[in-house]
């Protein structure tokens, strides 16, 4: 059984026991359980359920493993012939989840 969920403006294919990194979820701490309600699709063997746009009765339960920062993204600006250079870095906050169950 797998599901397609939407969180942080992105869609993820999840199964029980899978861990994934999503955009930061506010107000949660490591070890806490979260319920993801935006389930777009459910697949269980032969049966496939597609939401319009979401499946109201479906829930995905996940455990927060950690809140951390993602990899550094470097932004480099340069103007030709003028010697202007600017290097800037950015690290986005992310939440690591482990899927514990899919409820239909």
From Swiss-Prot:
Keywords: Ribonucleoprotein, Ribosomal protein, RNA-binding, rRNA-binding
GO cellular component terms, A-Z: cytoplasm; ribonucleoprotein complex; ribosome
Gene Ontology MF, one: structural constituent of ribosome
Domain of life where this protein originates: Bacteria
GO biological process, one term: translation
Any one Pfam family match given in the protein's UniProt record, by short name: Ribosomal_L21p
Regions crossing the membrane: none
InterPro entries per the UniProt record, alphabetical: bL21-like, bL21-like_sf, Ribosomal_bL21, Ribosomal_bL21_CS
PANTHER family linked to this entry: 50S RIBOSOMAL PROTEIN L21, LARGE RIBOSOMAL SUBUNIT PROTEIN BL21M
Homology family: Belongs to the bacterial ribosomal protein bL21 family.
Function: This protein binds to 23S rRNA in the presence of protein L20.
SUBUNIT field: Part of the 50S ribosomal subunit. Contacts protein L20.
NCBIfam families: L21 (TIGR00061)
Protein's UniProt name: Large ribosomal subunit protein bL21
